[in-house]
C-alpha cells in the first residue's frame, strides 16, 4: 500500500470546528509540518474534507 506525505499549508484559525478536528486527527499542528500516512479510504476521506488546507504527495 502506498504512503502519503501530508503537509499543512494554510492556517486553521477561523475554520469550522470539524475541519480543525480533522486536521488535528491527521496529526498536523503547525503550518509547514508533514506527516506520513498509509493510503487508506479513511485517510483519503479526511484529506478530501480539508484539501484546501493541505498539500499531499504520494510516496
Swiss-Prot record:
Transcription recorded as keyword: no
Domain of life: Bacteria
GO cellular component entries: cytosolic large ribosomal subunit
Keywords assigned: Ribonucleoprotein, Ribosomal protein
Any one Gene Ontology molecular-function term assigned to this protein's record: structural constituent of ribosome
One Gene Ontology term from the biological process aspect of the record: translation
NCBIfam families from the UniProt entry: rpmD_bact
Family, as annotated: Belongs to the universal ribosomal protein uL30 family.
Assembly description: Part of the 50S ribosomal subunit.
Name assigned to this protein: Large ribosomal subunit protein uL30
Source species of the chain: Clostridium novyi (strain NT)
Taxonomic lineage: Bacteria, Bacillati, Bacillota, Clostridia, Eubacteriales
Amino acid at each position: 500500500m502506498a504512503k502519503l506525505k501530508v503537509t499543512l499549508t494554510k492556517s486553521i484559525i477561523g475554520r469550522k470546528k470539524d475541519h480543525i478536528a480533522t486536521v488535528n486527527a491527521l496529526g498536523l499542528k503547525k503550518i509547514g509540518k508533514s506527516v506520513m500516512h498509509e493510503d487508506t479510504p479513511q485517510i483519503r476521506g479526511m484529506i478530501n474534507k480539508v484539501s484546501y488546507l493541505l498539500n499531499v504527495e504520494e510516496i
